[in-house]
Amino acid sequence: MNKIVFASLALFLLRDCNVEGPRFRGPIAGTWGGENAGLIAFDTTAHVHIGCTAGDTKQQLVADSAGRFDAPGRYNITLYPVARGPDHPARFTGSTDGHVMTLTVTLTDTAVTLGPVQLVFGKEPKMGMCPICRKPAARSGQE
């Protein structure tokens, strides 16, 4: 009888435990850094650098119940040494557990994909010759 109770309890705990590791859900904020990549997330947008390229999301990054996010934005792949433009429409996708983030930027009007890159919350990005250069511009609501 004790074996049945123990087995039932074990199955119940396994069913309700998160065996995939901790998940993060909700708004993403703050500085996230990695090797030659970085993200600064605000309550209305996020600014991203991967190498000498950069862009901004059009909305706040918010992780779903599985820690995944997907946001539209604009991205410039001809930024260095002089920003030549244009800013391309892009999708910023990835996942996070609240400490480590995997991020991919996909330009939707070309075949260009940057990443995936791995970023750590609270870590300063190590950008080399192309530092994170600007806070996202205020949005006028017209695009």
Language model segments and positions:
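Sec-dependent N-terminal signal peptides
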Residues: I4-F12
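C-terminal motif of bacterial Sec signal peptides marking the signal peptidase cleavage site
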Residues: R15-D16
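Tryptophan-anchored aromatic micro-motifs
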Residues: G21-G38, A71, K126, P131-S140
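A short, compositionally biased
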Residues: G26, A41-T44, D97-M101
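Residues that act as N-cap/strand-start positions at coil-to-secondary-structure junctions
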Residues: G26, G33, F42, G55, ...
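Beta-strand secondary-structure signal
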Residues: T31, H47, D70-P72, T93, ...
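N-terminal glycine/threonine-rich, aromatic-flanked beta-hairpin/loop signature
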Residues: E35-I77
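Beta-sheet ligand-binding and adhesion/scaffold domains
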Residues: Y75-E143
